[in-house]
Amino acid sequence: MRQFIISENTMQKTSFRNHQVKRFSSQRSTRRKHENQPTRVILFNKPYDVLPQFTDETGRKTLKEFIPVQGVYAAGRLDRDSEGLLVLTNNGALQARLTQPGKRTGKIYYVQVEGIPTQDALEALRNGVTLNDGPTLPAGAELVDEPAWLWPRNPPIRERKSIPTSWLKITLYEGRNRQVRRMTAHVGFPTLRLIRYAMGDYSLDNLANGEWREVTD
């Protein structure tokens, strides 16, 4: 009886060890397979009111309705109420290069604001403003004409007839939550429409709103 119990325990331990070896081996194999995949980079011109993800439990519009490509994920966020360039990739190193603050990758935005910013307001944006999560890095900020490539937004923005609007070109080197909107509001000119045009070396470059294309890294 004693021999039977010892034999049974030994069999159980051996089986558990074999299970561990197989599980860890499978994990390494999956990781190697992922690392050996060729890099894919998708550029998408995100419309207004689309989430920068492929699923949503509440039924809102997602990337799945536009991009039939599996295994790629957005590098950084572009809020539901913002438009423009979204870079998706399966390469973690590329995602980090585009989004990590220490990389200081430039991101260009065209921003329609309420009112016409003064030179003092532009200088404040360039030098950095102090938000509730700390001071921002110096940024590029200039008053520009409405972009010639601009597409109509659906629905249109709500403008007040008594207040003019203007366009800014803003370049950030960090990526905080809703940073552009908070910066323009801080200097007294609320954002009405926000379009990301470029991230690092990637740009919209005549990509139509709601369309995507694959590029080489």
From Swiss-Prot:
UniProt keywords (A-Z) are: Isomerase, rRNA processing
Pfam families in UniProt: PseudoU_synth_2 (PF00849)
Q: Kinase: present as a keyword of the record?
A: no
Stretches that traverse the bilayer: none
Q: EC?
A: 5.4.99.20
Question: GO biological process: any one?
Answer: pseudouridine synthesis
Give me the reactions it catalyses: uridine(2457) in 23S rRNA = pseudouridine(2457) in 23S rRNA
Q: Which GO terms describe its molecular function?
A: 23S rRNA pseudouridine(2457) synthase activity; RNA binding
**CDD domains, per this entry?**
PseudoU_synth_RluE (cd02566)
Identify which residues the record assigns to the active site.
D79 (nucleophile)
Q: What class of enzyme is it?
A: isomerase
Q: Which family, according to UniProt? A: Belongs to the pseudouridine synthase RsuA family.
Briefly state the protein's biological role: Responsible for synthesis of pseudouridine from uracil-2457 in 23S ribosomal RNA.
* Protein's name in the database: Ribosomal large subunit pseudouridine synthase E
Organism this protein belongs to = Shigella flexneri
Annotated gene: rluE
